[in-house]
Amino acid sequence: MAGGRNGVKFVEMDIRSREAYELAEEWFDDVVFSYEIPPGVLDKERLKEIKKEYGNVAITLINPKPSLVKEAVQRFKQNYLIYVESSDLRVVRYSIERGVDAVISPWANRKDQGIDHVLARMMNKRGVALGFSLRPLLHQNPYERANALKFMRKAWTLVNKYKVPRFISSSAKGKFQVRGVKELISLGIAIGMEEVQAKASLSFYPLGILERLK
């Protein structure tokens, strides 16, 4: 474990493989293992095994149908975090209405920031966080990366204005995608956060989200 820096605990909220998790554990004080659910499959026994192994676990729904979001929230929110990663605004809105814990990178594969003022206000009201993920940027060409950062800045402006919970994560699927605290803080600054806001997105807000599972 990394150990608190000047009394601050840093949390990596979205790690998606064993090898990435093991590396992230060295760099962060707490790590959430994010289990990508196969399409349409919510296996209670498999989830129990993962929770027993990793402790803090997020069920991550990739481009889900609303019915799967509803099932995940109803059956599993008591013991797991629920994340939704989708560029479909209908799914994003439904997920926020259902009270998932976080929406991850809704701007991915879109030509806008993936949320608007209405959704940002709703996220504040429902306590739904916005996850700013580094991983998609790693595989983009310079033009695509510049556009993605532009949309992330617009999303951050809404998050900041409406006081939406937030976190920054590598969302790593392999150990070479894992990034440390300083690099994730740098991402926050690149999208318009002040340093203290970027640190809070790796500490204060993640710890608040994890508090629900205690």
UniProtKB/Swiss-Prot annotation:
One Gene Ontology cellular component: ribonuclease P complex
EC top class, as a word: hydrolase
SUPFAM superfamilies reported for this sequence: PHP domain-like
Enzyme nomenclature, EC number: 3.1.26.5
Keywords of this entry: Cytoplasm, Endonuclease, Hydrolase, Nuclease, tRNA processing
Compartment(s) of residence: Cytoplasm
One protein family per Pfam: RNase_P_p30
Molecular function terms, GO-annotated: ribonuclease P activity
Physiological role: Part of ribonuclease P, a protein complex that generates mature tRNA molecules by cleaving their 5'-ends. The RNA is catalytic, but its KM for pre-tRNA is 170-fold decreased in the presence of the 4 known protein subunits (Rnp1-4). The protein subunits also decrease the amount of Mg(2+) needed for activity.
SUBUNIT field: Consists of a catalytic RNA component and at least 4-5 protein subunits. Forms a subcomplex with Rnp2 which stimulates the catalytic RNA.
Protein name: Ribonuclease P protein component 3
